């Protein structure tokens, strides 16, 4: 129970500050923001709270509240809060803070105790009395909702001095932990995702399990635990057939134990006699050591082992027993990146305890053991482990036997890869492991071998490779019981994205309220002319290349997500209204170009407590915040508030304005910045003090007469975005000239082009 030990609710009042019983805090609205938002870059759960009567009672006015809460959650002392030091949150409680803020910290602490640490949370008042918006970092929505419910229950108990003990706190933590285990990524997948995040590679979960996309669009790679896009289905099938694997390895000079596939227990004994005792009996297509019995020397043992192995696989194999230690070598992309050594698990009798009791006291009490994937060692369950029961029977014991004091009882002979030995692997052993993975056809493989000393070649010690496993578990290397953890997640990430490849495609985000759909279409048109298969999500629909595949309003998170998972897409343009950012967050984590056209539209956002245009700065700055360091923000210099977002950008800034006298332009150009503006009825590209006309595009008066649906500001923003993306200037000018502003005309033009011979020059869809 750790930090929860001894936590109790104080049952007596210690002062006369307030003895009122309070109604529950009402949770008015719960919303999961799946991408960057006005709060943070990461997904958060946003909760609208109505404190009711508690609005008039901060924490220092509720009798005994701080003592009760800190007794229940002692680790709150570690929360710095806004004070910036240990004990900061306790100081805020003592001085007086409101219950919405307290709930934020309670939920965060429950997540920490459940093994999903988070340090981010905020609580802000709204324009309505007693109503607050509270958010906290949420890597999984369902986990966050359970943590919120449990935290709400705990907080109200502490406020009202209701019975709530350490046991109740532990139940709350267990409920959150159970949801983590049920919903969140397994440890192997999480390690790879974490390594990708460290490298700045985005990830997207594709199902409720461990299927994850790393990167975007055409540059993505997918993983499923330790299987990747490069993992061969044929290789997996070969690895699952142990006899075929051995045959292929032997033909390539890899040492393997001789063996035979048998159909029944009698054949198993005959094979054992042919091979020579002792032998191993195991399933031909199982893994993780299931159903494997080692060092069998008698007919009875072999036949009993057959009965253990048969339910675990389609066939049963009998192999020569190789003396030595079990080892697991992890091969990634033709290199051994980690190795672990197994150990025989034993208990020692005390003359009083049964074998079952010794297992509980000496083995299962080890904090490294657990039933969940996060533990490096498994719990040992005697009642359901036929292999263990057979092992005890070989020693003339069972679970109820009481071994004499000092007697060592073998519990498990294999499957306990707990000790890191990566630095000890001999180069010839590593070569054999890499060759085995290559022969089977796996980019990532767990190579099981037996050797007396992993630091010496296999041949002289008669060592051998006994299995090649597809989709190997990584936990033994991430959390070895003995030795140093190995960065296997990073090794797999580097294998998938060599040479520091970011896994990204050009992403252009368009934020604002005025003419943003046609602007997004024009940008997508120019990118497509530049040679990239382009996806577009905007209010006019969802487009792949020049085809509209969905006519519904697609300026939202779901439509953007559809583009980013599409392997055919080489660039995307996504329109983001303020409501999209407030309701869902952005569909992407970072972008190469972020465009902000204006800060209008507050009147439509009253449901989000946005009532003034000045509040839009906090919302639409999100688009600027996510621009990559090597990217560009394209900002409307005609609106000083939009131009004022420039310092928030990690990358470069291009300003645009129809009025060349816009105040922001002069200062920006004087500092050497780029700008797109209008002079002499022409589009001008400015780089510091140097200016030139955009080639390929003539007088704007003529152009605007034939492109009625495109505002001058949208034209300038699109030119700036294309310039930032490195599209040739003459192609930008020609593309703007050829753009079909009217959507229906563009759709009709595309339909017509599809009925003509390929050589017919037809206007294509923007």
Residue ranges and their predicted role:
Residues 504, 583-765:
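Acidic, Mg2+-coordinating active-site environments of NTP-dependent enzymes
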Residues 129-131, 135-274, 287:
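Conserved N-proximal alpha/beta basic substrate-recognition cap immediately N-terminal to
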Residues 20, 221-380, 427-430, 489:
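Active-site nucleotide/adenylate-binding loops and adjacent lid/helix of ATP-dependent enzymes
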Residues 2-198, 335-338, 343-350, 354-357, ...:
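ATP-dependent carboxylate activation and anion-phosphoryl transfer catalytic cores
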Residues 499-545:
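Walker A (P-loop) phosphate-binding motif
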Residues 547-584, 596:
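Conserved nucleotide-sensing/catalytic segment adjacent to the nucleotide-binding pocket
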Residues 196, 448, 537, 575, ...:
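Residue-level signal for inorganic ion chemistry
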Residues 358-416:
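Extended, charge-rich helix/loop segments that form flexible
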């Amino acid at each position: 129970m750790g930090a929860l030990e001894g936590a109790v609710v104080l049952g007596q009042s210690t002062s006369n500050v307030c003895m009122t019983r309070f109604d529950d805090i009402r949770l008015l609205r719960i919303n999961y923001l799946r991408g960057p938002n006005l709060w943070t870059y990461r997904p958060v759960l946003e909760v609208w709270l109505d404190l009711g009567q508690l609005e008039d009672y901060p924490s220092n006015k509720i009798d005994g509240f701080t003592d009760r809460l800190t007794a229940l959650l002692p680790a709150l002392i570690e929360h710095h809060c806004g004070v910036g030091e240990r004990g900061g949150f306790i100081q805020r409680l003592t001085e007086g803070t409101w219950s919405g803020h307290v709930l934020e910290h309670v939920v965060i602490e429950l997540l920490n105790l459940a093994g999903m640490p988070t340090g981010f949370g905020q609580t802000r008042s709204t324009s309505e009395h007693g109503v607050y918006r509270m958010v906290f970092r949420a890597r999984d929505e369902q986990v966050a909702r359970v943590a919120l419910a449990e935290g709400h229950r705990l907080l109200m108990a502490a406020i009202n001095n209701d019975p709530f003990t350490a046991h109740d706190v532990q139940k709350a933590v267990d409920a959150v932990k159970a949801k983590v285990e049920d919903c969140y990524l397994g440890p192997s997948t999480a390690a790879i995702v974490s390594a990708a995040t460290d490298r700045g590679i985005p990830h997207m979960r594709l199902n409720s399990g461990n299927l994850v996309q790393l990167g975007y669009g055409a540059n993505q790679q997918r993983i499923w635990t330790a299987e990747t896009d490069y993992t061969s289905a044929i290789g997996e099938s070969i690895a699952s057939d142990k006899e075929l694997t051995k045959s292929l390895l032997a033909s390539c000079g890899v040492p393997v134990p001789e063996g035979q596939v048998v159909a029944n227990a009698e054949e198993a004994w005959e094979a054992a006699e042919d091979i020579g005792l002792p032998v191993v009996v195991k399933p031909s297509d199982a893994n993780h050591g299931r159903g494997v019995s080692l060092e069998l020397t008698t007919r009875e043992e072999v036949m009993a082992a057959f009965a253990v192995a048969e339910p675990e696989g389609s066939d049963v194999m009998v192999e020569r027993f190789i003396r030595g230690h079990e080892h697991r070598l992890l091969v990634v992309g033709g290199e051994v990146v980690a190795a672990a050594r197994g150990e025989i698990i034993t208990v020692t009798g005390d003359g009083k305890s049964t074998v079952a009791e010794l297992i509980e006291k000496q083995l299962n009490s080890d904090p490294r053991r657990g039933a969940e994937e996060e533990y490096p060692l498994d719990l040992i369950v005697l009642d359901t482990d036929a292999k263990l029961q057979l092992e005890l029977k070989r020693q003339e014991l069972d679970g109820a036997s009481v071994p004499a004091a000092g007697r060592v009882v073998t519990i498990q002979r294999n499957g306990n890869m707990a000790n890191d030995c990566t630095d000890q692997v001999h180069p010839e052993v590593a070569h054999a492991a890499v060759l085995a993975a290559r022969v089977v056809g796996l980019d990532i493989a767990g190579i099981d071998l037996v050797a007396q000393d992993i630091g010496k070649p296999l041949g002289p010690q008669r060592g051998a490779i006994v299995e090649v496993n597809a989709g190997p578990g990584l936990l033994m290397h991430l959390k070895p019981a003995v030795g140093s953890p190995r960065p296997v997640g990073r090794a797999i990430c580097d294998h998938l994205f060599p040479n520091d490849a970011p896994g990204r495609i050009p992403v252009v985000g368009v934020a604002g309220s005025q003419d943003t759909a046609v602007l997004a279409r024009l940008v997508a048109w120019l990118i497509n002319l530049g040679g990239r298969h382009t996806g577009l999500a905007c209010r006019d629909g969802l487009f792949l290349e020049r085809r509209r595949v969905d006519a519904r309003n697609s300026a939202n998170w779901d439509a953007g997500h559809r583009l980013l998972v599409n392997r055919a897409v080489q660039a995307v343009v996504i329109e983001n209204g303020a409501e999209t950012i407030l309701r869902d967050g952005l569909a992407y984590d970072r972008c190469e170009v972020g465009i902000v056209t204006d800060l209008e539209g507050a009147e439509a956002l009253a449901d989000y407590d946005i009532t003034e245009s000045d509040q839009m700065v906090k919302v639409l700055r999100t688009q600027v915040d996510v621009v990559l360091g090597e990217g560009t923000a394209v900002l409307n210099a005609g609106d000083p508030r939009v131009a004022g977002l420039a310092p928030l950008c990690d990358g470069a800034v291009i300003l645009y304005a129809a009025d060349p006298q816009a105040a922001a332009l002069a200062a920006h150009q004087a500092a050497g910045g780029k700008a797109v503006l209008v002079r002499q009825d022409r589009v001008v590209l400015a780089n510091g003090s140097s200016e030139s006309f955009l080639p390929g595009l003539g007088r704007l008066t003529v152009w605007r007469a034939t492109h009625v649906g495109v505002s001058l500001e949208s034209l300038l923003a699109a030119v700036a975005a294309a310039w930032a993306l490195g599209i040739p200037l003459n192609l930008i000018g020609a593309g703007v000239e050829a753009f079909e502003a009217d959507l229906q005309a563009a759709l009709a033009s595309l339909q017509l082009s599809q009925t003509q011979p390929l050589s017919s020059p037809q206007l294509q869809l923007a």
